[in-house]
Amino acid sequence: MLSRAKGRCELCGITNEQKMLEVDHIFPKSLGGKDDLSNYQALCYSCNAAKRNTDDTDFRLFKTLYEHREDNCLFCDIQANDRKRIIAENNLAYAIRDGFPVTDGHTLFMPKRHVNDYFGLVQSEVNAINILVQEQRTLLMASDSSIEGFNIGMNCGEVSGQTVFHCHVHLIPRRRGDVANPRGGVRHIIADKGFYEDKK
């Protein structure tokens, strides 16, 4: 069972080096589950404790989900063929510097799985991306004292401006004076909507 799981929790994807894995029934014996190889799964101790013996969810399906990649996708390709661009990663996500940065230090965060946008992420991927965002924010702040703020966001769908249809989150460092008037921030994605206070 542990060999089949390739050293990862079949729910959250964490490695057995980070958390001990446990083999347990998919369908609990208390619900009629059998002692059979097809009814076992490997979960980290946290996921197994949360599952308890009342849940019959087959978490092995998540392994296939997490491994999904697509041909001719820029961010799927980077993982396989351009790993030198990767500046940080964890089990389910990775980070690169933007190839066309808005400001110095502009960083992108992607799930390793191919998924079109933020709304297709599962919670463990959201968590994995957030961990990397926090880590990179800390590193950027420590390495560049001119950074005083950040814009963070994503484009979801063609009408929002998305051009690469593999979910990616932008972290854009901001410095005093990088624009004449920063008030309104992300509201400026729609012309004339940024300075809403002028319309009161």
Mark where each language-model region is:
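Histidine-centered catalytic micro-motifs used for acid/base chemistry in nuclease
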Residues: 22-28
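Short Cys/His-centered divalent metal-binding micro-motifs
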Residues: 17, 40-64
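Short, intrinsically disordered, charge-biased short linear motifs at domain edges
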Residues: 28-34, 57-62
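Short beta-strand-alpha-helix junction that forms the catalytic/metal-binding core
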Residues: 9, 31-50, 166-171
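Short metal-coordination and nucleic-acid-contact micro-motifs, chiefly zinc-binding Cys/His arrays
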Residues: 2-6, 36-40, 65-69
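A generic "alpha-helical surface" signal
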Residues: 3, 38, 42, 124-131
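HIT superfamily nucleotide-processing domains
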Residues: 66-200
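Short cysteine-rich loop/turn motifs with clustered Cys
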Residues: 1-21, 44-46
